[in-house]
Amino acid sequence: MDVFAGLDVGYRDPTAFCVLGYDWDSEKYYLLDEYLDAEKTTEQHATEIRRLMEKWDIDYIFIDSAAQQTRFDFAQNYDITTTNAKKSVLDGIAHVAGIVDNDNLFIDQRCKESLSCLDQYQWDPNPNLAREKPKHNMASHMADALRYALYSFETSTTGF
């Protein structure tokens, strides 16, 4: 099983980190663990992420490409290597929805933030938007981390 993670960085908004496994034989994804916390230092987040890296032997961490300073700090100061996530929002949401709709994602019941984010994720109702986009709320951070992981892992492993 390959183990990988998604990371959405925030400060006032929470930093969200989700750990997933992919079973190549069954072609199923497993959400194994999560971390969500706000108003913490980079060092505090790094400590939790390192703990999860050691616990799960994570192969890849896909991070929001807008978080380049955090990406550099993690690599330089905490030996946490990350890869920029694919961020095509609508394609990524469609990809995750396909996985969920086809019963290919199993979520550990202890991952309460992830369960909640999938239940509460919604589109922004603003009729003045030029295109659809997800509503920014407390559910969106873990959902973004999950999207970064699932969309980037799938596309990076099937592109060869």
Regions found by a protein language model. Give the residues of each.
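Short, hydrophobic alpha-helical segments
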Residues: A149-T157
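Short beta-strand scaffold segments in enzyme catalytic cores
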Residues: T15-G21, R147
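Residue-level detector of short, conserved catalytic/binding motifs and their immediate flanks
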Residues: T15, D59, A143
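Anionic group-transfer/hydrolysis microenvironments
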Residues: D8-G10, Y35, A66, L146
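Mg2+-dependent endonuclease catalytic cores in nucleic-acid-processing enzymes, primarily RNase H-like
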Residues: C18, W24-N137, S156-F160
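Basic, amphipathic alpha-helical segments enriched in Lys/Arg and hydrophobic/aromatic residues
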Residues: H141-R147
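Coil-to-beta-strand transition motifs
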Residues: Y11-P14, S26
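ATPase catalytic-site recognition across NTP-hydrolyzing enzymes
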Residues: M1-V9
